[in-house]
């Protein structure tokens, strides 16, 4: 016992050793609650039974000392038992000595749940916080998994274990279907590049007109024209393969070769040729315009949709170069024309990639591309399962059917049958006739159903996720907040990329300050917990 005499007044101080209960989810510890006078003032800085006034993210509450004493291992419990102001300041973010108020820059929603914990002794999971943010808040306030109520503990632990693996473990893509702020920030950074560019405002609006169909009425019209040209090009390619056009072009080619001229100039129907030239001119206009208006040339050539646009016009110009290299305009002989015809056929086959241009105007096609990009493991597993199954059942079918001469003559010849059987396609061009062969076919079909269904489910879930995410991003950037997007376009004139980052940080600080100023300095009714 310590006895002090201060100005005729005797103070007695006992230093009892108090063993704190085990912190919820933490290790047991011992602490000595010191009620000695403050070394600076000579008297205790707070009474032990004084209510604790706290301010958490703008939410002010009074907590009774008796409620905090029930949980001395928590942060507020240790703050209530702090022996000096210096010790208390280490437990909070700030302290107002005049108002005797402790400030914590933490989530106010979790603090309301924390108040319920001090009343009942049980903590409930908040749906507004993800499991990781909830765990960080609980650790900060000195709570653990044991503090969770029985109704929420199993759900919390399950979400905490499965959430990191509910998506791609090695992928940086967030599992939330809400549009990621980083994706919207990428658009903002791209727009900021026009601030220092020549004719930046005009280029920016033209670029948005070509890239965002929902930006304005001209952008919608441009998108409709682009889709129509793509469909017309695909239709012309399909019509060109009809027998009527093939016979007509073959007769014209024979007549041209007999006259010593190139057959390539007369093979195409005049109408289809003019339509092809118009489509090529439009595609070339699109590629060159996007290249000139792009905020970054380097990013332009890295974007998959831009590469598709380049591939859609590349065969036409390669055909012209091949014709010039092989003497397309001179009568040098039929052999060179034959080589040119083979080259042109290869280049014409590349025109089929024009159908991928529709991905620029289709959310589903873009979602499919993102799904395949993030599902290479599942696709690899699917191919591995199919390869193993085809190899096994092809060998069994060859052994059972090789004497029947029904198409199972060799094991490589059986691979085709095994592939169409495991994928449950079943063309019926090759079928087993023996009992053993039919049993092998039945096992192949059942095995294919099980093997294909496993990775396909994961791929389908990823496609659904990317589709919902893409729709949410489009709604956030173009539809639901169009006016704010227009304000952003006006604000980036003359703004560099660095200044945009600074303004974004300043706005975040301003929103935090606004949250604090919304709460009055003194609440009309103090609440005691």
Swiss-Prot record:
UniProt feature, compositional bias: Basic and acidic residues: 502-514
Keywords for the protein's UniProt record, in alphabetical order: Cell membrane, Ion channel, Ion transport, Membrane, Potassium, Potassium channel, Potassium transport, Transmembrane, Transmembrane helix, Transport, Voltage-gated channel
Residue positions of motif Selectivity filter: 424-429
Membrane topology: Multi-pass membrane protein
GO molecular function annotations of the record: delayed rectifier potassium channel activity; potassium channel regulator activity
GO CC annotation: nucleoplasm; perinuclear region of cytoplasm; plasma membrane; voltage-gated potassium channel complex
Any Pfam family matching the protein: BTB_2
Residues in the Cytoplasmic compartment per record: 1-217, 294-304, 362-376, 468-529
Ranges annotated as spanning the membrane: 218-239, 271-293, 305-322, 341-361, 377-398, 439-467
Record's subcellular location: Cell membrane
UniProt intramembrane annotation: 412-423, 424-431
Domain notes: The transmembrane segment S4 functions as a voltage-sensor and is characterized by a series of positively charged amino acids at every third position. Channel opening and closing is effected by a conformation change that affects the position and orientation of the voltage-sensor paddle formed by S3 and S4 within the membrane. A transmembrane electric field that is positive inside would push the positively charged S4 segment outwards, thereby opening the pore, while a field that is negative inside would pull the S4 segment inwards and close the pore.
Job of this protein: Potassium channel regulatory subunit that modulate the delayed rectifier voltage-gated potassium channel activity of KCNB1 and KCNB2 by altering their kinetics, expression levels, and shifting the half-inactivation potential to more polarized values. While it does not form functional channels on its own, it can form functional heterotetrameric channels with KCNB1 and KCNB2. Each regulatory subunit has unique regulatory properties that can lead to extensive inhibition, significant changes in kinetics, and/or substantial shifts in the voltage dependencies of the inactivation process.
Protein family membership: Belongs to the potassium channel family. S (TC 1.A.1.2) subfamily. Kv9.1/KCNS1 sub-subfamily.
Stated name of the protein: Delayed-rectifier potassium channel regulatory subunit KCNS1
Species per Swiss-Prot/TrEMBL record: Aotus nancymaae
Gene assigned in the entry: KCNS1
């Amino acid at each position: 016992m310590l006895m002090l005499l201060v100005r005729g007044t005797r103070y007695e101080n006992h230093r009892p050793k108090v063993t704190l209960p085990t912190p919820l989810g933490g290790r047991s510890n011992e602490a000595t609650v010191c009620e000695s006078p403050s070394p600076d003032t000579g008297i205790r800085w707070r009474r032990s039974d004084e209510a604790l006034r706290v301010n958490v993210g703008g939410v002010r509450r009074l907590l009774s000392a008796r409620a905090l004493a029930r949980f001395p291992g928590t942060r507020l419990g240790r703050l209530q038992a702090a022996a000096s102001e210096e010790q208390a300041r280490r437990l909070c973010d700030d302290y107002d000595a005049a108002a005797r108020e402790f400030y914590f820059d933490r989530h106010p929603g979790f603090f309301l749940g924390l108040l319920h914990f001090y009343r009942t002794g049980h903590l409930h999971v908040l749906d507004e916080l993800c499991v990781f943010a909830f765990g960080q808040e609980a650790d900060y306030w000195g709570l653990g998994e044991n503090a969770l109520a029985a109704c929420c503990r199993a759900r919390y632990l399950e979400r905490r274990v499965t959430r990191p693996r509910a998506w791609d473990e090695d992928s940086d893509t967030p599992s939330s279907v809400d549009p990621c702020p980083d994706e919207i920030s990428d658009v903002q950074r791209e727009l900021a590049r026009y601030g220092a560019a020549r004719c930046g405002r005009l280029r920016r609006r033209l670029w948005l007109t070509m890239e965002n169909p929902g930006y304005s009425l001209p952008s919608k019209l441009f998108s409709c024209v682009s889709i129509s040209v793509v469909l017309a090009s695909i239709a012309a390619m399909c019509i060109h393969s009809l027998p009527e056009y093939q016979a007509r072009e073959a007769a014209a080619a024979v007549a041209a070769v007999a006259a010593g001229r190139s057959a390539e100039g007369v093979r195409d129907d005049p109408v289809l040729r003019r339509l092809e030239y118009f489509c090529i001119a439009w595609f070339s206009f699109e590629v060159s315009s996007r290249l000139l208006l792009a905020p970054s040339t380097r990013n332009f050539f890295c974007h998959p949709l831009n590469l598709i646009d380049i591939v859609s016009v590349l065969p036409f110009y390669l055909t012209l170069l091949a014709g010039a290299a092989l003497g397309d305009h001179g009568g040098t002989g039929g052999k060179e024309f034959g080589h040119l015809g083979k080259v042109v056929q290869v280049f014409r086959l590349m025109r089929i990639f024009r159908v991928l241009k529709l991905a620029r105007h289709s959310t589903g096609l873009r979602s499919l591309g993102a799904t395949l990009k993030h599902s290479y493991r599942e696709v690899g597993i699917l191919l591995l399962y199919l390869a193993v199954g085809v190899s096994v059942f092809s060998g069994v079918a060859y052994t059972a059917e090789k004497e029947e001469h029904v198409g199972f003559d060799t094991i490589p010849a059986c691979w085709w049958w095994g592939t169409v059987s495991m994928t449950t396609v079943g063309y019926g061009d090759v079928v087993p006739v023996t009992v053993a062969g039919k049993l092998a076919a039945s096992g192949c079909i059942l095995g294919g159903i099980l093997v294909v269904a496993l990775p396909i489910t994961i791929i389908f879930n990823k496609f659904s996720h990317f589709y919902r995410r893409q729709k949410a991003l489009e709604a956030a950037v173009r539809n639901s907040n169009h006016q704010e997007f227009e304000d952003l376009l006006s604000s980036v004139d003359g703004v560099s990329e660095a200044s945009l980052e600074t303004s974004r940080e300043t706005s975040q600080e301003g929103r935090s300050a606004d949250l604090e100023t919304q709460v009055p300095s003194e609440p009309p009714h103090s609440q005691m917990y």
